[in-house]
């Protein structure tokens, strides 16, 4: 994301409370200002699911019902379609109605290209051992409410077997991060559910305004150890990582991807992003 794009986003959101953010995202979509869109699915997520299937709920020809996945802040839905290719029934959620409209059009374009034999869409084909792509649904609404669940014909008690967060947490103001952690804990299936986070922008100092707001390994550890609690900082400004409490999440794996989006690379082409895999304590 260029400095110009970061400056426009930060000037739009940085000094505004979370409650005022709602109308601003649809306005940016209506302007067709979407610097967070990567033009395709996460290479890091694709490679992880192929290489480490033991770390996520499996999907095979005998899996019934299919596990459910959620992508909050899904934008045009590239990662939603990717997870469907791995066999998950996926809900793509975004606050902006225009995002849902573009996601629907993107899905239509991908399916048409597949029928025409376009090899560039092979990433969205069912993976080996997966009988067919999972069902895809698009929802519009506030991640922190239950209205989008009802819109997707799901009960408010619904939990998900896999949740993928990329450029969602970093879009929220720092004050909303404990609320994000609590909501993720509530939405994750306690029986084997996995939260997969692609850390971006990794290492950006928290003193620099966002969005995107900076993230570190310790930020996730502190937030998810005690969902809903505000992390504390040490005298040197580093984040204190507390012990995990009941209802918290533990990190199962921290992966340095071999590939990621260009936005997650250093100037020399090395990968800056990290990929985290989490489960609820006891899961």
What spans do the regions from the language model cover?
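A conserved beta-strand element that flanks and buttresses the S-adenosyl-L-methionine
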Residues: 164
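Class I (Rossmann-like) S-adenosyl-L-methionine-dependent methyltransferase catalytic domain
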Residues: 2-70, 76-158, 174-283
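Short catalytic micro-motifs in class I SAM-dependent methyltransferases
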Residues: 167-171
């Amino acid at each position: 994301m260029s400095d110009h794009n970061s400056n426009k986003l930060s000037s739009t959101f940085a000094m505004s409370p979370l409650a005022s953010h709602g109308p601003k995202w649809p306005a940016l979509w209506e302007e067709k200002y979407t610097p967070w869109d990567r033009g395709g699915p996460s290479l890091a997520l694709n490679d992880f699911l192929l290489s480490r299937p033991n770390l996520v709920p499996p999907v095979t020809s005998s899996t019934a019902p299919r596990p459910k996945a959620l992508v909050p802040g899904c934008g045009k839905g590239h990662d939603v379609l990717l997870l469907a290719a791995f066999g998950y029934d996926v809900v793509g959620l975004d606050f902006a109605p225009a995002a849902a409209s573009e996601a629907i059009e993107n899905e239509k374009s991908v399916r048409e290209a597949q029928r025409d034999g376009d090899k560039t869409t092979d990433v969205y084909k069912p993976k080996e051992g997966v009988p067919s792509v999972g069902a895809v649904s698009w929802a519009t609404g506030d991640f922190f409410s239950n209205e989008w669940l009802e819109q997707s014909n799901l009960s408010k008690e619904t939990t998900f077997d896999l949740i993928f967060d990329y450029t969602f947490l970093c879009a929220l103001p720092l004050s909303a991060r404990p609320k994000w952690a609590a909501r993720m804990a509530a939405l994750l299936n306690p029986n084997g559910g996995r939260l997969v986070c692609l850390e971006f922008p990794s290492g950006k100092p928290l003193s620099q305004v966002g969005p995107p707001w900076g993230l570190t390994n310790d930020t996730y550890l502190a937030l998810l150890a005690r969902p809903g609690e505000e992390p504390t900082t040490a005298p040197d400004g580093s984040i204190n990582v507390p012990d995990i409490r009941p209802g918290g999440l533990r990190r199962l794996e921290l992966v340095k991807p071999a590939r990621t989006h260009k936005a997650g690379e250093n100037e020399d082409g090395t990968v800056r992003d990290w990929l985290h895999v989490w489960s609820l304590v006891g899961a």
